Amino acid sequence: MKNKKVLVILGGTSGEREVSLDTGKACIKAIKKLGYKVSTFDPKKKSLSLINKKKIDVIFNALHGKDGEDGVVQSYFEYLRIPYTHSGVISSYNAMNKVISKEIFKKNRIKTPSYFVFRKNNFTKAKLNKLIQIKKIKFP
């Protein structure tokens, strides 16, 4: 088992790149300490298509944010049939989509604060003032 080759994927292109690099470095240190062979991959520097499944046994996903936590890389890893750490494709997508997450919580009777949905392309301060009445939003 200690001969397993672990590819730590870190960095990426999201706004959370720096956090991902820090996470990846900590993971690399811990995985090496356990005696595994570790290599790294940063999708900002190389295309995911360059991942060679013959040279790795498992992928440790240390990416944060878009493409790393939303099911995108998970989908690619499943396509390659490489085991990976992280939630699966659908769970990752649902967790990153806050509206879907809220609907799942409500459907399963999990208390969650009220919310409003704003689309980036039509968000203005004037619309915000018209749509939100802060007193109506309370924690469960």
Set out the residue ranges of the language-model regions.
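Active-site nucleotide/adenylate-binding loops and adjacent lid/helix of ATP-dependent enzymes
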Residues: K2-L10, D22, V38, K53-K54, ...
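Cofactor-binding loop segments of dinucleotide-utilizing enzymes, especially the Rossmann-like FAD-
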Residues: G11-G12, P43
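A short, GP-enriched loop/loop-strand-helix hinge that lies immediately N-terminal to
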Residues: G12-E16, K55-M96, K111-K120
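Glycine- and acidic-residue-enriched helix-capping/strand-helix junction motifs
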Residues: T13-A26, A30
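Hydrophobic alpha-helical packing residues
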Residues: I31-K32, F77, F105
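A generic structural motif
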Residues: K32-S39
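Eukaryote-biased intrinsically disordered, low-complexity acidic regions enriched in Ser/Thr/Pro
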Residues: T40-K53
